[in-house]
Design a protein with these regions (language model features):
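Conserved SAM-binding loop
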Residues: 38-39
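A short acidic, Gly/Pro-enriched loop at the edge of an enzyme's catalytic core
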Residues: 59-74
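A short glycine-rich, Lys/Arg-flanked "PGG" loop and its adjoining helix->strand segment in the class I
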Residues: 88-111
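A short beta-strand submotif of the Rossmann-like class I SAM-dependent methyltransferase core
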Residues: 75-79, 84
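Conserved SAM/SAH-binding beta-strand->alpha-helix loop
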Residues: 31-33
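Conserved SAM-binding loop of SAM-dependent methyltransferases across substrates and taxa
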Residues: 2-21
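Class I S-adenosyl-L-methionine
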Residues: 124-166
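Conserved SAM-binding motif I beta-strand of class I
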Residues: 24-29
């Protein structure tokens, strides 16, 4: 995407963190244009920080980027976008992207890594099922948003769940 979430995170950490540890920030997107845009913003506004953007296709089995390991991974709409395409993937024996997303992301995690997903397309239960099926990920925490009730069902317009890798 445009890197907004990553930029907000690094600004907040720089304001709040008082230790001497340095952090590296990496943003990924499928679109080369999005990566170019976010890289330009990073260069103009955050040149003193370790910020990198890469064009990555998570749905390629041979994606070498997945060899990288991260402590925290944030997804704000990636799974939602992947789920819109219901075409089968040749690399994954005809499975659809939504069904391989979690196992692909898990490759970038070590024990104790956190994956925070924000979705406007899935319910809490649906998201938990998608992410925990066939992975070593389990629910760690969630963000509670204001909810509403419609047709006897209570819900919210957005769901954010943090998963930890065991």
């Amino acid at each position: 995407g445009n890197g907004h979430l990553l930029f907000q995170l690094l600004e907040d950490i720089n304001e709040e963190y008082e230790g001497d540890k340095t952090f590296e920030y990496t943003g990924i997107d499928y679109s080369p244009d999005s990566v170019k845009f976010a890289s330009g913003v990073a260069k103009r506004k955050y040149s003193e920080l370790k910020v990198n953007f890469e064009q990555v296709d998570l749905l390629q089995e041979s994606c070498s980027f997945l060899q990288n390991k991260f402590d925290i991974l944030l997804d704000k709409g990636t799974l939602d976008a992947i789920a819109l395409n219901q075409e089968s993937l040749a690399d994954f024996n005809g499975k659809i992207g939504m069904d391989v997303y979690a196992s692909q992301v898990e490759k970038m995690m070590v024990q104790g890594s956190i994956l925070l997903i924000t979705s406007c397309n899935f319910t809490k239960d649906e998201l938990i099922k998608i992410i925990t099926k066939d992975t070593n990920l389990e629910v760690w925490d969630e963000i509670n948003y204001p909810s509403f009730q419609f047709g006897g069902v209570k819900g919210s317009t957005v769901v954010s769940i943090a998963f930890v890798r065991n």
